[in-house]
Curated annotation (Swiss-Prot):
Its EC number is 7.1.2.2. SUPFAM superfamilies: C-terminal domain of alpha and beta subunits of F1 ATP synthase (SSF47917), N-terminal domain of alpha and beta subunits of F1 ATP synthase (SSF50615), P-loop containing nucleoside triphosphate hydrolases (SSF52540). The keyword ATP-binding applies. HAMAP family: ATP_synth_beta_bact (MF_01347). It comes from the Bacteria. Keywords: ATP synthesis, ATP-binding, Cell membrane, CF(1), Hydrogen ion transport, Ion transport, Membrane, Nucleotide-binding, Translocase, Transport. This is ATP synthase subunit beta. ATP binds at G153, G154, A155, G156, V157, G158, K159, T160. The keyword Ion transport applies. It comes from Lactiplantibacillus plantarum (strain ATCC BAA-793 / NCIMB 8826 / WCFS1). It catalyses: ATP + H2O + 4 H(+)(in) = ADP + phosphate + 5 H(+)(out). GO terms for molecular function: ATP binding; ATP hydrolysis activity; proton-transporting ATP synthase activity, rotational mechanism.
Amino acid sequence: MSTGKVVQVIGPVVDVEFSLNDKLPDINNALIIQKDNDDTLTVEVSLELGDGVVRTVAMDGTDGLRRGMTVEDTGSSITVPVGKETLGRVFNVLGETIDGGPEFGPDAERNPIHRDAPKYDELTTSTEVLETGIKVIDLLAPYVRGGKIGLFGGAGVGKTVLIQELIHNIAQEHNGISVFTGVGERTREGNDLYFEMKASGVLKNTAMVYGQMNEPPGARMRVALTGLTIAEYFRDVQGQDVLLFIDNIFRFTQAGSEVSALLGRIPSAVGYQPTLATEMGQLQERITSTKKGSVTSIQAVYVPADDYTDPAPATTFAHLDATTNLERSLTEQGIYPAVDPLASSSIALDPSIVGEEHYQVATEVQRVLQRYRELQDIISILGMDELSDEEKTTVARARRIQFFLSQNFFVAENFTGQPGSYVPINDTIKGFKEILEGKYDDLPEDAFRQVGKIDDVVEKAKSMVTD
């Protein structure tokens, strides 16, 4: 392989010169810089400047680098371990373990992080709903197998618990695998998530990849590809349905923006990199269903200054199939999961995909909840007595629906003391249909809180009467 030397260091960007007689490394190749203390630094080729010089982005800090240091071309892009051995482990962008466990040997199976998206003839053409067992999602904003879902929510509204429950349900009901990718988020949150997942028993079905806030932009820019590469192996080689969590997709864009100017590119709108749409597309197009399996991605989306026209979230939205919005006002009412039934949406909520009955029940639930929201101002000012009999019935059913959208989670059993519930989609539709028909108008509202199926509501109501 070719050998060169460091000629310039500008923050996370390193220029490397090779002899004109040697073969220049390809774009996206990984180069290894030999540092003075027997340590090494991996950099990735981004540009060829001419005269044997390439411009690279460092995957770790460039402290201690100096001109003249030896650089070796590895001959390929960054490669990371793949396969069942990755489950239960935590990796960095280079596929090195960071959980204190044993390292992967040189004979471990590895794949390059830069790969082409599946070809058209490999894709599955059918749109299939992925059952999660979570009522509010399955009924009102169903996930598409191999789709991309945006998860919106502030701090403390239950994003982490919802993620854990999805990982648990996919593992238990679908024998599925999950890959969690922490992109540019707080190290403390990543640490907490690791120990919470260990305690709740879902870690054994999960591979975790972290490139957190304190790491150089090169690592944050590529760590999403590392997680995706691990997920693709489970899909393509083992025929699995994989859940890929990316938290936070905005940080992927932000990291690219940080190095773009240093690479010599002229900034585009709002200072973002001119290659924003291309970089996002290369990542998102690899997340899809093939005839072998699927990668379904749930991406936390940070919206800077709540500006949805900002190029970063706007570019992300173009790829999303569904959105799950978590609402703080629901947590204040003790409704978990705190998914906003009116703000959340999905392209799969279509009679040709979910069926006519599911579609009719879902739209009627949304209509009743929307009418209840409109009546709340009147109720708060004038009271319930000013409503017509029809409006009183609508309010009563809407409150029962709102409470019935909640349920106990398996991963929260240790905290709530209540057993979790997985609700099949047919039971979900049956329950809401019967509430809308008025079959349970005589049952107390509290019987609908934090239960699974509609039969559980009836049982809970009986026990409340007995007590």
